[in-house]
Amino acid sequence: GDEEDEVEETLPVAEEGREKSCTTWRNSCMHNDKGCCFPWSCVCWSQTVSRNSSRKEKKCQCRLW
């Protein structure tokens, strides 16, 4: 009926918002297996804070591919 059509229309908008929030940087991939990153993977790596610094920081990001 009409109710089903309304549900279909609102879903893509929610998905779009979720995808945008999923690409934000994060400090950890923990607790994401059933959350934002699914069905994508969350990847972490270390990188130096700046070119003339040896200090490293951990960066994590959901990969949408």
Curated annotation (Swiss-Prot):
Q: Which UniProt keywords apply?
A: Calcium channel impairing toxin, Disulfide bond, Ion channel impairing toxin, Knottin, Neurotoxin, Secreted, Toxin, Voltage-gated calcium channel impairing toxin
Q: What residues make up the propeptide removed on maturation?
A: 1-18
Its job: Modulates Cav2.1/CACNA1A voltage-gated calcium channels (P/Q-type currents) in rat cerebellar Purkinje cells and hippocampal CA1-CA3 neurons. At saturating concentrations (>10 nM) decelerates activation kinetics and slightly increases peak amplitude without affecting deactivation kinetics. In vivo, does not cause death when intravenously injected into mice. In rat models, through its activity on Cav2.1/CACNA1A, has an ameliorative effect on memory defects provoked by hyperstimulation of N-methyl-D-aspartate receptors (NMDARs) in the hippocampus.
- For the keyword Secreted, the answer is yes
| Other facts noted in the record for this chain | According to the nomenclature proposed by King and colleagues (2008), 'Gsp(267)' comes from the species name 'Geolycosa sp (strain A267TDLS2-KZARNA)'. This species has been reclassified since that study, as indicated in the work of Oparin and colleagues (2016).
Q: Disulfide pairs? A: C22-C37, C29-C42, C36-C62, C44-C60
* Primary location class: secreted
The record's comment on protein family reads: Belongs to the neurotoxin omega-lctx family.
Q: Per its record, what are the GO molecular function terms?
A: calcium channel regulator activity; toxin activity
Its name, as the record gives it, is: Omega-lycotoxin-Am1f
Q: What is known of its domains?
A: The presence of a 'disulfide through disulfide knot' structurally defines this protein as a knottin.
Protein's UniProt keywords contain Disulfide bond: yes
Q: Name where it's found.
A: Secreted
The domain of life is Eukaryota
Q: Name one GO cellular component term.
A: extracellular region
Tissue specificity here reads: Expressed by the venom gland.
